[in-house]
């Protein structure tokens, strides 16, 4: 697999999703990543530390320049806990849990986050404003309500299927209520 192509596709998808979700500085962005799927394998079976590092470093660079916080979801072997910066965990009141990821428990994305973040910790659960799922890892449990599917400009990074989610405030009220327009809502 061509690493330059994977990096280019990752950059293109992330920038597109950020434009479509209109995330602001300080927002939380969750990443689910199967490096196995990126390489054309079965999720969890052919994990690649190199691919995890390439993708996470690329995303951290993009989000960091915009002041958006990255949370990297692990696999079910760590109960889908997430790696974030300690400062983010403290700022958002997130519960820190004790686990250190491995290639096959947490995954390549989490290992990369531990490598590239300043002071990484694992947290049990977040409510991110948006997120990107590379390889059908199921990030929905970590994106706040109301979730809105975002169609990325590319359907795949490498061989991995790509989906994205944004969120919007709940619409409350009744027939007489009025709602402000925003970039996410589809009416």
From Swiss-Prot:
Q: Name one Pfam family in it.
A: DUF436
Q: Which domain of life is it from?
A: Bacteria
Disulphide bonds in the chain: none
Q: Do you know which Gene3D superfamilies this protein is assigned to?
A: Hypothetical protein TT1679
Among NCBIfam families, the record links this protein to: TIGR01440 family protein (TIGR01440)
Family statement drawn from the similarity comment of this UniProt entry: Belongs to the UPF0340 family.
- Recorded protein name is UPF0340 protein SP_0663
> Organism, per UniProt?
Streptococcus pneumoniae serotype 4 (strain ATCC BAA-334 / TIGR4)
